[in-house]
Amino acid sequence: MDKREIFDALDDFSQNLMLTLAEVEAIKKNLKSVIEENTVLRLENDKLRERLGEVEKTGPSKGGGQGRENLERIYLDGFHICTDFYGQRRDNDEEECAFCNELLFRE
């Protein structure tokens, strides 16, 4: 191999290395996003399990108002109680969900 061929091979190797580095960075970014989402979901899961434990300890509801109170507590904890989005976390706790409110305040 002459010097020119060695230089070209080294240049090609360098370009391939740069592309591989860019791919690794993209994978790292994606992994970070997945880990963050996983953490949020684990926290939600823990909160829901805690809530379920509280509900199971209280036993079956004796009055019709207790079910509504439980739904209201779940809603105030930041979760949807409407049939369309039940159990999903509300994006913004300050914003009200019209479907959930209709269910809560229905007579």
Curated annotation (Swiss-Prot):
Zn(2+) binds at residues 80, 82, 97, 100. Binds 1 zinc ion per subunit. GO terms for cellular component: nucleoid. It holds the Pfam family YabA. Keywords: Cytoplasm, DNA replication, DNA replication inhibitor, Metal-binding, Zinc. Its cofactor is Zn(2+). It is found in: Cytoplasm, Nucleoid. InterPro entries: YabA (IPR010377). NCBIfam families: PRK13169.1-1. Involved in control of chromosome replication initiation. Inhibits the cooperative binding of DnaA to the oriC region, thus negatively regulating initiation of chromosome replication. Inhibits the ability of DnaA-ATP to form a helix on DNA; does not disassemble preformed DnaA-DNA helices. Decreases the residence time of DnaA on the chromosome at its binding sites (oriC, replication forks and promoter-binding sites). Tethers DnaA to the replication machinery via the DNA polymerase beta sliding clamp subunit (dnaN). Belongs to the YabA family. Homotetramer. Interacts with both DnaA and DnaN, acting as a bridge between these two proteins. This is Replication initiation control protein YabA. The gene is yabA.
